[in-house]
């Protein structure tokens, strides 16, 4: 796809940049990459001298524009066909309709009944187009109007953070990308805190903002938000989330939960992902907020924030007022990481998709060949539950956005394997001046919490071994002292499986326990083998041999039990657990046995 660059000077809005390319309005068949949020793309289309249908990802965005413009028809779940028809019949020069993807078909049906060809008479703008890729895994309906979109004579997609899209129609219809290029330094400061003591770092950050009058926290788990409110005893708060989540929070006693933005904002405001993009937050009482983004991989992978899209969109929610440059005081991302997270390549995803298709074809063939209604019914049920079904659009065809979503997820997962990966992703995004504060501890509060939550002994052993190995690694690399090493080991002592596991770990090491699959029976066998080998080496060491040699006079008859006891004492003092028998005595000395008394004459030491 060809990319055309449009220069944007400081203080200018989107129409100025487009005019430099010779456009008075957003041109057709383009993906408009704004680079920056808040350039007025939606307003540009609302004010354009043509009929427009603007597809927005979420309702709050639409409601926000309704407060600014009185000529818009909002179409979403609550909207009736009657209202749409009434609006389309109005004698207005330019009609402006904003809709969610799910409600687009209401417009199509209403227009058809009125004999209006929307594909010829309206311009279609798909706003925040990256959401078609990002959200389709849990919201398949977000791409519902995509076939309609490509049917429009005039259309465009727009976002400050568009993702690459593989749909063949972009190529077939000759789409170009218009890239807005600001000719000034537009980067914003961002502090990235990477931690394995999640709550501790949040509390420290909030304590550092005790004088802040407005704090806005973006976190995509409502239960996690409720936990923060409860655990940190936050009283002056508001939570903005879906209607379903708001009801759930209210049942839990989190009463200030809303599905739409309500003003004034509280001192501490929480936002879930439906408020990450497109929405304009303008009324914050002249007080610039401090923004905190949270990623807690202990809770869920969907708390990951993409530095290339969501982080940019989040900071862009707060709109300029007048000539002010900064719209917030500070921007912080507090995140955990997971070095063990699996990241699949594009090729591996391709193999998976191919197998999904083959699985479907196999079952479909069985269904077609089944000679029994019950068999057909059973196979039909299995067909509906195949992963393949998640890849289909409403026409039963493979949805390219579903494939893009699989690849996009792996891209973001890769950032969260390490603090460095996440930092570099933010650097490459180009929007932020990033300060990395990696406060990962050798053993953090999150590590202890995982251990305490592990219910199975085998799971506890696995986590203990991982922590012990990490402690040793930090000590070997000089990151902690011996005293700190012992302190971290002590932190693990309260875990039921600790003593057993550390005894085994100190003897046979991590690799042997891993190869035993953390199973007690196999670990015990390996420990016994180790002890036996260790005892043998100690018994035959020059130190032990010398101690035994010096313990007995030669050429005197000595009671066998006395000899055995002395050797046992030497063994015990040196950590040797082997039994002592007459053969043990004979292994060290040439002996002559007395025929009358239970004794040996030690003739010669063998070594």
Task: Give the ranges of each region predicted by the language model.
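Conserved Walker A/P-loop ATP-binding site and its immediately adjacent core
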Residues: 37, 41-79, 163-166, 221-223
């Amino acid at each position: 796809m060809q990319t055309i660059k449009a220069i944007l000077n400081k203080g200018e809005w989107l129409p100025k940049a487009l005019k430099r390319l010779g456009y008075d309005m957003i041109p057709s068949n383009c993906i408009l990459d704004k680079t920056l949020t808040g350039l007025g793309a939606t307003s540009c289309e609302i004010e354009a001298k043509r009929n427009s249908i603007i597809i927005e990802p979420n309702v709050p965005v639409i409601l926000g524009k309704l407060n600014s413009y009185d000529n818009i028809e909002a179409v979403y779940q609550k909207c009736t066909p009657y209202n749409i028809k009434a609006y389309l019949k109005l004698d207005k020069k330019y009609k402006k309709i904003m809709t969610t993807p799910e409600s687009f078909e209401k417009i199509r049906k209403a227009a058809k009944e009125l004999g209006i060809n929307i594909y010829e008479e309206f311009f279609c703008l798909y706003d925040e187009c990256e959401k078609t890729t990002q959200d389709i895994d849990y919201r398949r309906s977000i791409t519902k109007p995509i076939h309609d979109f490509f049917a429009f004579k005039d259309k465009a997609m727009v976002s400050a953070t568009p993702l690459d899209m593989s749909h063949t129609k972009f190529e077939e219809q000759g789409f170009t990308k218009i890239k807005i290029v600001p000719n000034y330094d537009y980067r914003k400061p961002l502090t990235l805190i990477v931690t394995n003591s999640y709550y501790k770092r949040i509390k420290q950050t909030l304590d550092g903002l005790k004088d802040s009058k407005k704090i806005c926290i973006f976190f995509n788990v409502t239960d996690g938000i409720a936990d923060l409110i409860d655990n940190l005893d936050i009283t002056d708060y508001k939570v903005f989330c879906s209607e379903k989540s708001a009801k759930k929070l209210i049942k839990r006693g989190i009463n200030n939960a809303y599905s739409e933005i309500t003003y004034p904002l509280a001192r501490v405001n929480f936002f879930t992902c439906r408020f990450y993009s497109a929405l304009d937050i303008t009324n914050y009482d002249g007080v610039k907020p401090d923004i905190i983004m949270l990623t807690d991989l202990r809770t869920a992978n969907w708390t990951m924030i993409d530095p290339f899209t969501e982080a940019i969109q989040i900071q862009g929610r707060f709109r300029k007022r007048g000539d002010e440059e900064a719209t917030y005081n500070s921007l912080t991302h507090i995140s955990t990481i997971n070095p063990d997270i699996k990241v699949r390549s594009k090729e591996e995803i391709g193999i998976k998709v191919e197998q999904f298709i083959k699985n479907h074809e196999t079952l479909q063939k069985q269904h077609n060949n089944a000679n029994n209604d019950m068999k057909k019914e059973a196979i039909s049920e299995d067909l509906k539950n195949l992963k393949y079904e998640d890849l289909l659009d409403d026409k039963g065809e493979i949805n390219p956005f579903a494939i893009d979503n699989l690849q996009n997820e792996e891209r973001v997962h890769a950032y969260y394997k390490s603090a460095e990966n996440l930092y570099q992703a933010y650097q490459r995004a180009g929007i932020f001046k990033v300060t990395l504060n990696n406060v990962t501890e050798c053993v953090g509060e999150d590590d202890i919490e995982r251990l305490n939550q592990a219910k199975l002994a085998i799971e506890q052993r696995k986590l203990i071994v991982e922590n012990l190995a990490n402690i040793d690694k930090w000590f070997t690399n000089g990151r902690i002292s011996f005293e700190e090493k012992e302190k971290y080991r002590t932190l693990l002592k309260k875990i039921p499986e600790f003593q057993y596991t550390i005894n085994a770990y100190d003897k046979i090491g991590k690799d042997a326990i891993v190869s035993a699959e953390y199973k007690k029976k196999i670990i015990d066998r390996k420990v016994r083998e180790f002890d036996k080998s260790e005892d043998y080496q100690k018994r035959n060491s020059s130190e032990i041999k010398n101690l035994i040699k010096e313990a007995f006079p030669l050429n005197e008859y000595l009671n066998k039990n006395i000899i055995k006891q002395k050797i046992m004492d030497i063994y015990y003092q040196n950590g040797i657990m082997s039994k002592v028998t007459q053969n043990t005595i004979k292994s060290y000395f040439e002996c002559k046995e007395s025929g009358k008394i239970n004794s040996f004459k030690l003739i010669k030491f063998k070594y």
